[in-house]
Amino acid sequence: MPLYEHVMIARQDLSNSQAEGLIEHFGAVLSDNGGKLVDQEYWGVKTMAYKINKNRKGHYAFLRSDAPSSAVQEMERLMRLHDDVMRVLTIKVEEHAEGPSVQMQKRDERDNRRERR
């Protein structure tokens, strides 16, 4: 089956548990249609470069999946219809990268910096 990576932005007024619940919900949609969610990362609330639907911030989530194209199309369709999801980006990849995504690596590197004066 083809491999995909998805980035989803949800509304800023959701709680963290609600945003993570969306990830679980769309992972279940994939598995119901014959695919599987390989990995998921919740990146937290981030400021966007421009407003989307009058929102300056959003909950970012990253999903890696191994699913047939019909399952991915159904998941994207449901994401676009869902009121809490503002944007979705899906790309097809040859292979999934090992370890955490670049966003999560940056967060880890920030912890190693010395304190400001």
Curated annotation (Swiss-Prot):
Q: Which GO terms describe its cellular component?
A: cytosolic small ribosomal subunit
Q: Which Pfam family name is an example for this entry?
A: Ribosomal_S6
Q: Which family does it belong to?
A: Belongs to the bacterial ribosomal protein bS6 family.
Record field: compositional bias (Basic and acidic residues):
105-117
Upper lineage is:
Bacteria, Pseudomonadati, Pseudomonadota, Alphaproteobacteria, Rhodobacterales
- Family annotation (PANTHER family): MITOCHONDRIAL 28S RIBOSOMAL PROTEIN S6, SMALL RIBOSOMAL SUBUNIT PROTEIN BS6M
Q: Where is this region: Disordered?
A: 96-117
* Species whose genome carries this gene: Ruegeria sp. (strain TM1040)
Job description of the protein: Binds together with bS18 to 16S ribosomal RNA.
- Which superkingdom is the protein from? Bacteria
User: What keywords appear on the UniProt entry?
Assistant: Ribonucleoprotein, Ribosomal protein, RNA-binding, rRNA-binding
**A Gene Ontology BP annotation from the UniProt entry:** translation
> Tell me, what is one Gene Ontology molecular-function annotation carried by this entry?
structural constituent of ribosome
Name-wise, this protein is Small ribosomal subunit protein bS6
